Amino acid sequence: MTTMNISTLRLDSNPITTSTKSTTHRSGALGYNGSYSCRLLQFQKKNKAPSIIVCSTKPLASVVEHQGVNDSGLTRIESLSQVSGVLGCQWGDEGKGKLVDILAKHFDIVARCQGGANAGHTIYNSEGKKFALHLVPSGILNEETICVIGNGVVVHLPGLFKEIDNLESNGVSCQGRILVSDRAHLLFDFHQEVDGLREAELAKSFIGTTKRGIGPCYSSKVIRNGIRVSDLRHMDTFPQQLDLLLSDAASRFQGFNYGRDMLKEEVERYKKFAERLEPFITDTVHFMNDAISQKKKILVEGGQATMLDIDFGTYPFVTSSSPSAGGICTGLGIAPRVVGDLVGVVKAYTTRVGSGPFPTEIMGKGGDLLRFAGQEFGTTTGRPRRCGWLDIVALRFCCQINGFASLNLTKLDVLSDLSEIQLGVTYRHPDGSTLNSFPSDIRLLEQIKVEYEVMPGWQSDISSVRKYSDLPKAAREYVERIEELVGVPVHYIGVGPGRDALIYK
């Protein structure tokens, strides 16, 4: 197998920026002369429509004003509103958990509002111990923080208890600190089995589910035969509810074998689960609104990301909930007027797990190189993530939907060895006309041409940098160009996986 050194990559000679099929140079020699040379490349990516790379001019001074910069970040964090949120701006895996973990010590409550165990957040404690959380909010490592699992979350109890056991065995106290909504729906093992059966049925239009049972559980919720956490308090009627749910699955999927022994075993399991869960069960709607009245500070931790939103994402290659701003209110039972600052988390490049449109994807060895440099493998599934350049069109769309007050740009350090970096700034129809917004039509997304700006890399290690002014000039220009293109300031910049590897801007 041929090895590649990321530090030797150049736009004109490596698969991270050129086609494996053909490349046609349109405007002379490639390369920088200190003032951003103009050039035009046209290349094919597998069977996709050709993408276009245009010259970038010298970055203008950002139209975004930056005020109140504090090296410690304390002023920046404490200025966040009473109810703030951290949401993903891409297709998930942006690094939301790290920011939530850092912010949590300044908030009384951290809450999950949607999704389930398909949301994988990796965080590290002060000793560098790694925790992969799927249901428990990332604020759990901060001893004084209360963690809420809201009504919009679907809860797999075996998975939840496994996370709690792992945390407590590593010295993290969970008793009295995790509150589970009595309105949250229960996700059963059979939901996971059904998820796999349904995926097999749809093999020709493979969506790429995590097979965690999220879709089937939300389906049960919507058709109104789901079972909620509060139902565990009524074990006299629980068997009938579960029988209805299992019978429905058996009638729908021939491969699902359901018998009375299964029902009996599940009922006995859930009697024990109910007893263990009881101390955690809470009317979280009342709890949250009471906390707001008491001026408690609340941080909402979004799962997945806006581009996976059931309404606004690349449907049907999406999740089954609303991981955008609207999901905060419906998933926690709080009023829109109380929601304040929302921070959007976005990688310095783009990744996606599973199938679906990905306009700025880098194909071949170039994508592999970026994947290994960024260790892009799913927290939940372990699957390799598809990698590509930062998609400004999609990011701007996410900023419009969510009304972000600021952005957290993560993994800037992963790009450190590249000689040149690209930003996907414009989508064009196959006929060359410009798309004015992010399209809902996935067929069109597969055909569009992406117009890129090319910027110089900084080719130096920035993982130890903690002040924005100490970043290389090219790195600062990259950050400021993103701000200029989307109209939202970048307040946090990730330069490594550790808690301290964060620049406050």
Curated annotation (Swiss-Prot):
Ribonucleoprotein found in the keyword field: no
Signal peptide: none
Subunit (UniProt): Homodimer.
Record's keyword terms, sorted: Chloroplast, GTP-binding, Ligase, Magnesium, Metal-binding, Nucleotide-binding, Plastid, Purine biosynthesis, Transit peptide
Cofactor(s) named in the record: Mg(2+)
Name recorded for this polypeptide: Adenylosuccinate synthetase, chloroplastic
Cofactor note: Binds 1 Mg(2+) ion per subunit.
Primary localization: plastid
Biological processes annotated in GO: 'de novo' AMP biosynthetic process; IMP metabolic process
Binding site for GTP: 92-98, 120-122, 385, 411-413, 494-496
SMART domains: Adenylsucc_synt
Pfam families named among the record's database cross-references: Adenylsucc_synt
Reactions catalysed, as given in the entry: IMP + L-aspartate + GTP = N(6)-(1,2-dicarboxyethyl)-AMP + GDP + phosphate + 2 H(+)
Active site: 93, 121
Organism, as annotated: Nicotiana tabacum
Biological role: Plays an important role in the de novo pathway and in the salvage pathway of purine nucleotide biosynthesis. Catalyzes the first committed step in the biosynthesis of AMP from IMP.
Top-tier EC class: ligase
Biological pathway: Purine metabolism; AMP biosynthesis via de novo pathway; AMP from IMP: step 1/2
Transit peptide extent on chain: 1-60
